[in-house]
Amino acid sequence: MNKILESIRGKLIVSCQALEDEPLHSSFIMGRMAYAAYSGGAAGIRANTVEDIKEIKKNVSLPIIGIIKKVYNNSDVYITPTIKEVEDLINEGVQIIAIDATKRERPDRKDLKNFIAEIKEKYPNQLFMADISSVDEALYAEKIGFDIVGTTLVGYTDYTKNYKALEELKKVVKVVKIPVIAEGNIDTPLKAKKALEIGAFAVVVGGAITRPQQITKKFVDEMK
């Protein structure tokens, strides 16, 4: 197995992201957040934007799942949606590049099969992760050549709004042979452990660790 994949097997990956409208939006802060995650035992980091990734690499040497969130007016796909974002991440040297692999139309109107074929031909040694929202998408991602699937978008597409992340994870791990990374709505250590027991290769946790406004709100709401 690939050494990068082996290094994250059965372990926690922390998603260090803060968008423009969030209190901790700052590449410097994300770098320190990644260091805090490393200090706590994280085996990898998921990060958004070249700027954040550069800063994170100054602070830790952990494997990075890189994405670029870019909104295009003609599509709902925004996680590394075009070849431009892929190449920006390639140039930054991230170990894994995650891409929206849902069945929604891409902004460049490219078919997902042709899109992954093009970038894998150009960058044969790069690991690509399919961010999916359903079992069918996971199966298709494996078929067309993705190296990893992640349950990142379960519940976030119009056709999976009522899906539960761990329930979908159970279905995905039964039908695909490539590593499945559990991600999305894993907001407690117990859920992370459960994901591994279900068969996840690794687990990504974001907001429950790195978004203090969300953590604070959970306390406030519970105390009402």
From Swiss-Prot:
Record EC number: 5.1.3.9
Disulfide bonds listed in the record: none
Record-linked InterPro entries: Aldolase_TIM, NanE, RibuloseP-bd_barrel
Superkingdom of the source species: Bacteria
Catalytic activity, reaction form: an N-acyl-D-glucosamine 6-phosphate = an N-acyl-D-mannosamine 6-phosphate
Gene3D superfamilies xrefs: Aldolase class I
CDD domains linked to this entry: NanE
The protein's annotated pathway: Amino-sugar metabolism; N-acetylneuraminate degradation; D-fructose 6-phosphate from N-acetylneuraminate: step 3/5
Any GO molecular function: N-acylglucosamine-6-phosphate 2-epimerase activity
CC terms in the record's Gene Ontology section: cytosol
GO biological process: carbohydrate metabolic process; N-acetylmannosamine catabolic process; N-acetylneuraminate catabolic process
Entry keywords, A to Z: Carbohydrate metabolism, Isomerase
Primary role: Converts N-acetylmannosamine-6-phosphate (ManNAc-6-P) to N-acetylglucosamine-6-phosphate (GlcNAc-6-P).
Protein family membership: Belongs to the NanE family.
NCBIfam families tied to this protein: PRK01130.1
Record's protein name: Putative N-acetylmannosamine-6-phosphate 2-epimerase
